[in-house]
């Protein structure tokens, strides 16, 4: 019923297995997927380009031709020429017993022009000790060097939607605050 491909986000060209791009879907039957977003024609027009529905999700096909989800494209972080999955960074922190929730996002780099830096907001389990350096050392085993956050911030609460999803754009907007820890390791 559908064609699913991973394509370049800028050119819409199909990518080879293993290459990360945008997951796109095309129904084999007209309007077999959906006619558009209800009451949002601009969003519908933006999502459907070149006969493909642009999901906004980054992913790739592995060697077994299985589709692997990487992250929401808007949540991907671009640092030093590398794409970093906020999901992978969050999962590395969630392995640490003291951490209850984690949200990774991009903040503008102060000394690298248009590049971003990785920041992670954390909620810790009540009564846990804040140990920034130790946490960075622990996640370093799971993350590529370029994905290790420069900034960490422990918060009491995250801004969330009614369904409990973390509102990352609110965290990005708030950015680096007085209580943000900078990684000098």
Question: Which functions belong to the PLM regions below?
Answer:
Residues 49, 144, 176-177:
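Generic surface-pattern signal
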Residues 4, 10, 25, 29-31, ...:
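AMP-binding/adenylate-forming catalytic core of the ANL superfamily
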Residues 173-185:
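Acidic/polar alpha-helix N-cap and adjacent early helical turns
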Residues 1-3, 11-21, 30-35, 47-50, ...:
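Conserved ATP-binding loop and adjacent catalytic segment of the adenylate-forming AMP-binding
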Residues 40, 50-51:
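Structured helix-beta-strand junction loops
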């Amino acid at each position: 019923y559908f064609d699913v491909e991973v394509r370049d986000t800028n050119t819409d060209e199909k990518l080879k297995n293993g290459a990360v791009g945008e997951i796109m879907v095309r129904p084999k039957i007209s309007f077999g997927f959906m006619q558009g977003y209800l009451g949002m024609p601009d969003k519908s027009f933006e999502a459907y380009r070149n006969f493909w529905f642009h999901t906004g999700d980054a992913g790739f096909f592995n060697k077994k031709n299985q589709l692997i989800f990487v992250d929401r494209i808007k949540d991907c972080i671009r640092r030093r020429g590398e794409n970093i999955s906020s999901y992978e960074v969050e999962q590395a922190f969630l392995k640490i017993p003291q951490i209850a929730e984690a949200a990774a996002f991009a903040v503008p780099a102060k000394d690298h022009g248009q590049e971003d830096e990785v920041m992670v907001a954390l909620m810790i389990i009540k009564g846990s000790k804040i140990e920034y350096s130790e946490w960075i050392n622990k996640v370093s085993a799971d993350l590529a060097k370029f994905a290790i956050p420069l900034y960490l911030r422990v918060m009491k609460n995250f801004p969330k939607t009614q369904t409990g999803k973390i509102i990352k754009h609110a965290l990005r907007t708030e950015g680096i605050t007085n209580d943000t820890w900078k990684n000098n390791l």
